[in-house]
Amino acid sequence: MLIVVSPAKTLDYETPLPTSAFTQPDFISDSAELIKACRTLTPVDIAKLMKVSDKIASLNAVRFEEWSTTFTQENARPALFAFKGDVYTGLDANSLSESEIEYAQTNLRMLSGLYGLLKPLDLMQPYRLEMGTKLENGRGSNLYQFWGSLITNKLNQELEAQGSETLVNLASNEYFKSVKPKELKADIVTPVFKDCKNGQYKVISFYAKKARGLMARFIIQNKISNVEELKSFDSDGYYFVEAESTATTLVFKREEQNK
């Protein structure tokens, strides 16, 4: 069973690491090509393209300039411990055991606008480049065109290596659009998390992101190997709703929070 999640905008390069192990990303030469395109942008260009503040634009202009094709423990850190957003709050990687980190290294992948696909222990230099960014590049006018089938092909290799035919999609729509379902040699299962608000159950972004991380953690800690076992997910009060689920979409609900 292979899990894919989105990256996070917020990064953490300060917290002590729970492991000294690391690996190298698979698409460094492709990332270097994107960095080359990014280096042609001024901070003003970046602010406009990425819809970010001048401060964030300036920071990322510096990051693009400082980015190197040599990844070391001095200029990078393992991706799983570098991302710090709602998904990663739920995943809480720093509290995973060594054996759980090893399991994640085989079964968890992070989609990325700059790096394509990251393994948990892949060294990652800091960046901001969301998958939906309309960055002109040598392969097209956006990152979906840039990555083409590369991410899907890599996922197929990973699935074949572990003898799995199931991909659990815990990524956002923006990121999962970088995967080509028709070319993927696996069944895609997408968990959907609905929270009750004012008597209605709906997907609330903040809660759903954290729930995706909780589900990833649940799979890693319990070494889940089939879809049936996913249905027993009950972290933070979520419960499986058979009546609203299908073979490819698993619906989980939770009662209203902060009453």
Swiss-Prot record:
The record's GO CC annotations read:
cytosol
Q: Which cysteines are joined by disulfide bonds?
A: none
Q: TM segments?
A: none
Q: Which domain of life is it from?
A: Bacteria
Gene Ontology annotations of biological process type: response to hydroperoxide
Q: Which InterPro entries match?
A: YaaA
Q: Which Pfam families match?
A: H2O2_YaaD (PF03883)
Q: Which family does it belong to?
A: Belongs to the UPF0246 family.
Q: Which NCBIfam families match?
A: PRK02101.1-1 (NF002541), PRK02101.1-3 (NF002542)
Q: Which PANTHER family match?
A: PEROXIDE STRESS RESISTANCE PROTEIN YAAA, PEROXIDE STRESS RESPONSE PROTEIN YAAA
Q: What is this protein called?
A: UPF0246 protein VFMJ11_2214
Organism name: Aliivibrio fischeri (strain MJ11)
